[in-house]
Amino acid sequence: VFLTGRRLDEALRGRPLVRGELRHPALATEDLAGRTVTAVATVGKHLLTRLDDGRTLHSHLRLDGSWHLYRPGDRWRGGPMHTVRAILQTAERAAVGYRLHDLQLVPTAHEQRLIGHLGPDLLDPAWGAELAANAVARLTARPDRELGLALMDQRVMAGIGNLYRAEICFLLGASPWAPVSTVDAAAAVELAHTLLARNAWRPEQSTTGELRPGARNWVYARTGRACRRCGAAIGSAWLGEPERPEQDRVVYFCPSCQPTPPGLTRASGSTAGRAGGTVAAPSEAGATADTRSGRTRRGGTAARSPRNSG
């Protein structure tokens, strides 16, 4: 999302819109033509497109949304036209948002109503000891909570998705089911910031240091393949809050490098209802969709970073 925001900012900032359509029932009558984009900012996974009339267009990509940039004459290839939710077009570029979520137009002064609940943004330019300490305090506020759930909670730290959740747990040597109290919270926060900052400006999301397809991640989307450290088969299972099973996500782990703490099993706690069973998972390249981003294609350039798994 960070890279998406930077690309949109470079394409739109300071340029008047010749076309500004919002294809959402609540916003269908809004015409942004004539407005000028003053900035495109990101906070965690939220995109904030600020306009010169004192309003902000808020959007969220979730798992399936995307913004694409096109030049005049390009064919729009980001998806079926009925999935287009926003068109912000200048004389030089068109930013087209597909399958956008939480599309809202709010006074810029009220942005905090949309993002005020978020924890420290791991890619905040002002990141330092104060924000890190805030994140540690939020992470340890519920010491018995599973680490894998706490890391994905945007109220703790903003910016971690499923890919980084899996990789952070692996690099800490901690099971996703381990209580937060059993890990070094400061180390977890520092690792999260380091990984996201290292990958912020490139479409390939690598946690291993390798950029070759198939070699970029330690455990994410590698179910059944050999652990790069110990050779054990990478496992995967459902993990989510018991009260919100519809939001369960697949978590990846090495059962040898990340042993489940004594007294806990992957079939207990937050995995109830799924029995913690191993699930089939796509290949690493397919799940991260690295080839979708940052590439100029016939018909346009994807403005977004890899699929919102990070």
Predicted feature locations:
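Basic, nucleic-acid-binding surfaces and adjacent catalytic neighborhoods in DNA/RNA-processing proteins
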Residues: 16-31, 41, 75, 135-280, ...
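Phosphate/anion-contacting hairpin/loop surfaces
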Residues: 57-160, 164-173, 183
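Gly/Gly-Pro- and Ser/Thr-rich, intrinsically disordered tail segments characteristic of DNA damage-repair
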Residues: 1-106, 226, 238, 295-298, ...
